[in-house]
Amino acid sequence: MIVRTTQAITGTERDVAAKDWRSKRIVLADDGVGFSFHETTINANSVSEFHYRHHVEAVWVVEGSGTLTDHETGEEFPLLPGTMYLLDGHERHRVTCHEQLRMLCVFNPPVTGQEVHDESGAYPAPVAS
């Protein structure tokens, strides 16, 4: 059994931040459970581009508001508490944040926790262990 709190993660190597977002990596690849689980906060009035070419991501919006844009179709979806989106086709997408968003995210395969988005918004391919 693994029990962690976001308070215990804050300020550690599991607390990863960039210009417009912060992600607390609660469950990671080294936990050996086949997925990773994160609490991610995106700053208000920001725009972030993502493209997870090597991962499937499920996102549950807990608080805030924004817009999700699918770059392939141009379709836009409101992001409000209670909204889930699943990037099961490795979609290139944009998150436009109106009010600070707090989201719970699951990645498969799991991330290690120190990945950095490249210029396209993607994480590198996972390395087999």
Swiss-Prot record:
Entry annotated with the keyword Membrane: no
Entry's Gene Ontology molecular function annotations: ectoine synthase activity
GO BP, one annotated term: ectoine biosynthetic process
Database matches in InterPro entries: Ectoine_synth, RmlC-like_jellyroll, RmlC_Cupin_sf
Pfam family, one: Ectoine_synth
EC number in record: 4.2.1.108
Superkingdom as given in the UniProt entry: Bacteria
NCBIfam families: PRK13290.1
Family statement drawn from the similarity comment of this UniProt entry: Belongs to the ectoine synthase family.
Described purpose of this protein according to its UniProt entry: Catalyzes the circularization of gamma-N-acetyl-alpha,gamma-diaminobutyric acid (ADABA) to ectoine (1,4,5,6-tetrahydro-2-methyl-4-pyrimidine carboxylic acid), which is an excellent osmoprotectant.
Protein's recorded name: L-ectoine synthase
Organism of derivation: Mycobacterium sp. (strain KMS)
Taxonomy of the source species: Bacteria, Bacillati, Actinomycetota, Actinomycetes, Mycobacteriales
